[in-house]
Regions:
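Secretory targeting signatures
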Residues: 1-27, 358-393
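Flexible loop/hinge segments at secondary-structure junctions
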Residues: 23-359
Length: 393
């Protein structure tokens, strides 16, 4: 018995230092993860960048907030670890980036923000009226279509100055998805997409660009992600819900209500997400212009330029963190945390990420070497001491 105990203790002495050495090696290895795309998610993504680096000082995130379309393009060129978008991949994009998985990361709202001197937030607008404004058919702030929805509001006899996105934008995709659902005329004349032929208005880059135009231009109006509207102290409309029963303020609660009605059934991680939409969902408290935000990543990350197996594991670790612990940072920035069922589905998607056709292990090649050395050591000690290491049948 004493002989067996000493042998086991000796084996532990062999394994523990090796494990410590491995952990030390892992901690000292630095990685820069790369992502690009959505400006909609940038305030939250940047918070994730800072908070994750506080926890893992050897991991840095370089995220380019360049618009969903540009981010997806970099993914198809295989020059970034992941792309972020407020719009799901369309069939043509999925064909250009075969083998990707879709990971919902958060949920956000899109405001109709305006700059009317002397008028606070809360102008009431319906979907059809919003469509007519952005088509250029309603051109004045005191138009009867707006005035009749807002009795007692001192609307100016001033021209509406429209600001819209000029870049390929997931925010545009979600906004025009909404307009296409509430206005047959919009659907036919303009349609839905990351880039559309805007009938009127001035284009700007990113949510920040549109917010900047509206904020600095009296009588301007544009569509701006909720976090940007709050951060820039912008005024925004209350939009009529899908039921037509109320005008709903964009808040975390009202966006969450809209998402809850839609996100009960989602495609497989590598399936067709192109028809997924959460805009204009039923419910008296549902804000109708809301969207999921997504991360796209290749199942086989070995095809990414400069990728390694260990770095692939760090990408998986980061993605797992943002859909679980990272969700605590969503609400303070006016994003809606993922429902638990959606986070569970994301876990499945992340588990499918591989490197070179093999599942990315929890530990890299160094760990495999450490384990091999430990096993050889155990066998050697066992042979010398006579300790039995196989189960007795």
């Amino acid at each position: 018995m004493k002989k067996t105990f000493l042998a086991m203790a000796f084996m532990l002495l062999l394994i523990v230092p090796s494990t410590i050495l491995y952990a030390s090696a892992q901690t000292s290895q630095s990685y820069t993860l790369t992502g690009a795309g959505s400006t909609f998610i940038f305030p939250l993504m940047d918070t994730w960048r800072v908070q994750y680096n506080n926890l893992h000082s050897n991991i840095k995130l370089n995220y380019q907030s360049i618009g969903s379309g540009a981010g997806i393009k970099l993914l198809t060129q295989k020059t970034v670890d992941f792309a972020a978008s407020d719009a799901p991949l369309q069939p043509s994009e999925q064909a250009a980036a075969p083998g990707t998985v879709t990971i919902p990361e958060s949920i956000g709202g899109i405001t109709i923000s305006y700059n009317l001197p002397g008028i606070d937030k809360g102008m009431k607008l319906t979907g059809p009226v919003i469509a007519q404004i952005f088509m250029g058919n309603i051109t004045m702030w005191n138009d009867p279509a707006i005035a009749n929805l807002n009795p007692g509001m001192n609307l100016p006899a001033q021209k509406i100055l429209i600001a819209h996105r000029a870049d390929g934008s997931g925010t545009t995709y979600a906004f025009t998805d909404y307009l296409s659902k509430v206005s047959p005329q919009w659907k036919t004349a303009v349609g839905q997409g990351k880039v559309v032929p805007w009938p009127v208005g001035t284009g700007a880059q990113g949510n920040a660009g549109v917010a900047g135009i509206v904020k600095s231009t009296p009588y301007a109006c544009g569509y701006v992600e909720l976090a940007y509207a709050y951060q820039n102290n912008m005024t925004y409309a209350f939009v009529q819900n899908a039921d037509g029963s109320a005008f709903v303020e964009p808040t975390i609660a009202s966006v969450a209500a809209d998402a809850a009605a839609a996100a009960t059934s989602l495609p497989a991680p590598d399936g067709d997400w192109s028809k997924v939409s959460i805009v204009n969902q039923p419910g008296s408290n549902s804000y109708p212009i809301s969207t999921l935000t997504y991360i796209f990543v290749y199942k086989d990350m070995s095809q990414i330029s400069g990728e390694t197996q260990d770095k692939s594991q760090e990408v998986k670790n980061f993605l797992t963190w943002i859909i679980h612990d990272g969700q605590q940072y969503a609400s303070p920035l006016l994003y809606v945390p993922l429902p638990s069922a959606m986070a569970t589905a994301d876990d499945q998607a992340i588990s499918e990420i591989q490197f070179g056709g093999s599942a990315v292990p929890e530990f890299g090649p160094i760990a495999a070497l450490v384990l091999a050395i430990a096993i050889v050591s155990i066998i050697a000690v066992s042979a010398k001491t006579g300790l039995r290491i196989t189960p007795k049948l």
